[in-house]
Amino acid sequence: HVRRRLLFDIALEVGLQSAYGRTLEATGSVGVHVAAGRASVLTDLARRALGGERQGVLDGFEGVADADLLAWVRGTLERMRRDGAIDHEWLSRYKRDDGKRLWIWYKRNRSQGQPAFPAGRAAPAFPRAGGGLDTRKSAFVPVGSPRSWYATWTRKCLRVAPTHAARLARVLLARLAEAGILTATDTSSGGTVYGLPAGRVVVSPLGETTGDDLLLVCDTCRTQLPAAAATVDQLDNAPCPAVGCPGRLRAGQRPAESFYRSMYAGAHVRRVDAHEHTSLLTADERARVENGFKRPEQAPGDPNVLVATPTLEMGIDIGDLS
């Protein structure tokens, strides 16, 4: 159970929650990318996807640059990672049932330590193709919609119409699954859900003084995307992933100094246990702290309402305080 929970938490740290707060990737402590093979292999795969269900390339796509095709594939894979579309055994029923939240909420594996994703909390968003999908009840992304992120990304990279982009996005995911880069799961409603095998998400520690360009910044909206050394060149000068932004991504260096990066890399992390968290104290010490807080005339070292906020944890009704 501990191993399952650790693997799930790691997937959240480098996936769905990678941009929330001071995460390891956001602070430049680690580089994360999806290992999908050589750039030439991905480019060939993308070019085959342009042929749809037939051999060869559809008319009008012969002149698409390799850099655009590579950005198309790489952007798709990294978006899946950041959306939390990383496979885990706890998400199997969730995927088969079209992303219904009950499998990661009140029907989750509580006994194994699976965390809850109630309404209001962002949930893993796997791309889904085929069949109908009620987006009011599912966090999954309907790839076939011309308004989906995947269709929009395809339109930006290949400069095609939204409807055509949605079809190409579906074909690309299918080709990636055929190549073993993605997994494909049939759903109860007849759709197909695509996911990243956890083993393809690679995490690499970054040194404090590396001079590599490991940050992608949009030249228009200034959106920042941490990048790994293995993939930053594949997205340099690619379209901005923000749906409504016309800008391009530019590779640059991360800030030279980071408080959180230095803290995470430190060997001696100290935990501060505040006295007002009295469940951590012995009975005698707890009584002394509580009495010192409540007495009308306090000594200089007594905790007071300005520094001790969790008063209910000390068994004190704050309404009784003057």
Placement of each model-derived feature along the sequence:
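Helicase motor interdomain insertion/brace
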Residues: 1-295
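Conserved two-lobed SF2 helicase motor
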Residues: 299-318
